[in-house]
């Protein structure tokens, strides 16, 4: 799965949860893992210290520490040296040196432990604790992003060289066969990188941005700023009126994204029909999702007959994209610093629910406008806040969540 540097927002979340003061220049790596919503492993210098997730039951951020977290946090509970196997076991109270500390810990809460040359994580169980995991004591040093970049510079340059060769190959072919070539640009980090790489190779590159009418103002402003700074030949296409189609099609969902066809593909198809064949450079990467992991460098569009998409940064991870941006001092959309991973329509059903609730915090007018629509279509507040509206047919994990919430209400 994909990885990335922790954003300013994510570092703020970690600092609040852990009562820490991590600085924004630290190379804290987050790796996506399966879950109901936002769920990522947190790495410091290659060591996983725990899992950061957005809890859809409590609608709040949670941190689940691993044993390695207590390499940077003083363990609260001291256990007497023993030859007993402790991992996965409840600890007899007489082995706990400072058992009085347990009275301030809630049932099932995490607590750090120290036993001899080991530190670890446990959970409170009754009048004692149960050890979840232990790790040998060692120094865990923080790495700064600038140090990470210095160590990985050669690898990033190799990725760039390969991507440029892919673009050159298709550009030469298009010139020889008199085919058109352009690039799609969303205002996000991936298409920023693929666009700038293509701009190094292709003369008078046509850069296509589709304004669906549902983008954040931040994105519209950034697209203009980006095009001006890098002297791009920007073409802005307007999407069809989403609100008109909404009444006929209903709420767009992850399993029925009619909005993508109406607001993006239809106007693009209309614009590209002047070409016999067109190759479009796209910033999609295989690590972004399970649906993209089987992509190859070239794919015929399933919607636009004369379009073929090419993916020059297909093999890049999220940290590679950000590394290239930092190494080349490239400007990026500030929405990434505010807690958004998906740069697109503000109420996109494919976005995380954690992101949708960030819209509530930062852009209440947009949030309330969409909430009013959802209520008009019959969704209640619980379904809205927990993101049930994002599916036409709920997947098993969301059906299970619904049952948990219903049982909580009965109690």
Curated annotation (Swiss-Prot):
Pfam short name (any one): PAPS_reduct
Gene Ontology MF annotations: oxidoreductase activity
Species for this entry: Methanocaldococcus jannaschii (strain ATCC 43067 / DSM 2661 / JAL-1 / JCM 10045 / NBRC 100440) (Methanococcus jannaschii)
Record CDD domains: PAPS_reductase-like_YbdN
Protein name per UniProt: Uncharacterized protein MJ0973
Protein family according to the UniProt entry: In the C-terminal section; belongs to the PAPS reductase family.
Cited Gene3D superfamilies: HUPs
UniProt lineage: Archaea, Methanobacteriati, Methanobacteriota, Methanomada group, Methanococci
Keyword field: Oxidoreductase
InterPro entries: PAPS_reduct_dom, Rossmann-like_a/b/a_fold, Sulfate_adenylyltrnsfr_sub2
């Amino acid at each position: 799965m994909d990885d990335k540097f922790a954003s300013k927002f994510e570092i703020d979340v970690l600092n609040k949860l852990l009562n820490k003061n991590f600085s924004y220049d630290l190379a804290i790596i987050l790796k996506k893992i399966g879950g109901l919503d936002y769920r990522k492993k947190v790495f410091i210098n290659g060591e996983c210290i725990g899992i950061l997730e957005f809890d859809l039951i409590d609608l709040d951020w949670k941190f689940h520490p691993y044993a390695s977290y207590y390499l940077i946090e003083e363990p609260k509970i001291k256990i007497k040296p023993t030859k007993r196997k402790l991992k996965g076991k409840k600890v007899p109270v007489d082995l706990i040196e400072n058992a009085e500390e347990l009275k301030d810990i809630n049932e099932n809460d995490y607590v750090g432990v120290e036993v001899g040359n080991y530190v670890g994580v446990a959970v409170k169980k009754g009048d004692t604790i149960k050890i979840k995991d232990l790790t040998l004591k060692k120094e865990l040093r923080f790495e700064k992003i600038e140090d990470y970049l210095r160590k990985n510079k050669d690898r990033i340059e190799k990725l760039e060289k390969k991507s440029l060769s892919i673009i050159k190959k298709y550009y030469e072919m298009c010139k020889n066969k008199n085919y058109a070539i352009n690039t799609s640009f969303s205002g996000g980090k991936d298409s920023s990188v693929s666009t700038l790489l293509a701009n190094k190779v292709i003369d008078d590159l046509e850069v296509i941005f589709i304004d669906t009418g549902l983008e954040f103002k931040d994105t519209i402003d950034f697209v203009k700023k980006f095009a001006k700074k890098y002297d791009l030949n920007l073409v802005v296409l307007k999407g069809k009126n989403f609100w008109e189609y909404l009444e006929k099609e209903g709420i767009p969902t992850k399993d029925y994204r009619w909005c993508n066809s109406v607001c993006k593909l239809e106007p693009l198809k209309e614009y590209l029909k002047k070409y016999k064949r067109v190759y479009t450079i796209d910033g999609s990467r295989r690590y972004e999702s399970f649906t993209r992991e089987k992509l190859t460098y070239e794919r015929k569009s399933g919607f636009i007959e004369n379009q073929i998409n090419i993916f020059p940064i297909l093999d890049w991870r999220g940290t590679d994209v950000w590394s290239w941006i930092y190494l080349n001092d490239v400007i990026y959309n500030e929405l990434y610093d505010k807690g958004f991973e998906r740069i697109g329509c503000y109420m996109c059903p494919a976005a995380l629910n954690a992101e949708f609730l960030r819209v509530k915090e930062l852009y209440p007018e947009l949030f309330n406008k969409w909430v009013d629509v959802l209520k008009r279509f019959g969704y209640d507040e619980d379904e809205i806040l927990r993101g049930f509206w994002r599916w036409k047919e709920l997947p098993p994990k969301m059906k299970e969540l619904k049952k948990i919430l219903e049982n909580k209400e009965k109690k």
